[in-house]
Every structure is written in structure tokens, then in C-alpha cells.
């Protein structure tokens, strides 16, 4: 109530409210639901897939719309840099390949495109996600093992995900813990899992591979 009072004092009347990473506040949904009942348009942003899927559906009354934003695709990368995607002539193909090489190295994080210290930016981003978004939220007990698993998956992408191997490699008590840690890294949008195409469900489940959500997480980090 005090926050709302201050907002009304500063901005006057308003009907849209943005909230970032509100899932870190206990029982945040009680406050949001109260705002929704007054007709307020509430926009919640966060970097955790669990919030965007399960928690919104569970805790918020009425309708809500989920929008997932990812780093730039190559087309968006070209549009942002005002680069032509034409590739009809030999010259156009050569120019486009040069831009594509840059994209494969630098990735599609918008903030990174104008950042000179790319490695520093990515290292800070990943460190913040692991320590603030994951370790704090999930109360990670074995922090060193978790960070080693996350870095291992990003540094070796694409690679098959084998929970028993991860358990042994990083000295965990069970492969279930390793599976949980991998799911946390996925939920934080550092990696995504891709299953092998097959008509047989056993093969699809068994042969999942880990990919970074953006190539910058492989190419612009201290390994």
C-alpha cells in the first residue's frame, strides 16, 4: 500500500503497473490479485520459466497472457544493425556471410551488440542468474557442484544430458539432485533441452541434448 501511495503521488492516476522479478517476494500473488480486481493492468517480467508457466496459472485469478522473449534471431540481429539480408548476388552472399559469422560469435543479446567488454557482460549476466535467480530462489545446498554443472552444460553444448554421469562427475549424492540442478538451469533460460526426433518416446527421452539459449553463452565467457 505504501508503494502504491508513493506511485500515485508521483505519477498521478494510472492503470498499468510493471513488476520485475516479483516472484522473489513471498505471497506476491495476493497483492497482484488485489490489483487485478481493481481493474489494474499488471505486467510481470521475470527470468524464470517456472514463474512464466506454473506459478502464473496457479496463483493468478482470471486470464493472463504469457510472452517469452529470447535473444535476437539472425533476422532480428540484421534488422537491429540495419544490415541487408539480401543474398541474390555473389556480393550480397559474401556480405551476409560476414554478418552471420559475427552473429555466430557475438550472439543475439541486444545489450551485447553495443558493448565493447562482451566477455565481462556475459560473465556478469551468468553469475547474476546463477546466484540470484537460481541459488537464492531454490536454496541450493551444493552451490559449487551446481555452478560446475551449469558451466559444464554451457561450455560443452551441444552435449547429451546424462544425470548419472553428472552425479559422478560432480560428486552429488544422487542423480535426482543432478536432474533438479539441470532443470533449474533450464528454467533460468541459460540452456534449453532438445530431444532427438523419433517415433519412440523412450528414444526421445533418453537422448536429450543441452544447448545454450544463445551462442554468446559459449563464445563470450571465461571457461
How should these model regions be labeled?
Residues 7-10, 25, 35, 156, ...:
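Hydrophobic helix-cap positions at the C-terminus of alpha-helices
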Residues 22-32, 54-55:
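Conserved ATPase-coupling elements of RecA-like P-loop NTPase cores
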Residues 17-20, 161:
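Hydrophobic positions in the central parallel beta-sheet of the AAA+
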Residues 8-12, 34-41, 59-60:
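Conserved catalytic network of the ASCE P-loop NTPase/AAA+ motor domain
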Residues 18, 41-47, 68:
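Structural recognition of the conserved hydrophobic beta-strand(s) that form the central parallel beta-sheet
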Residues 1-16:
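Short glycine-rich substrate-engagement loop in P-loop NTPases that contacts/grips substrate
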Residues 116-223:
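Accessory nucleic acid-recognition modules appended to NTPase machines
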Residues 47-49, 54-160:
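Interdomain motor-coupling "hinge/lid" segment immediately C-terminal to the ATP-binding subdomain
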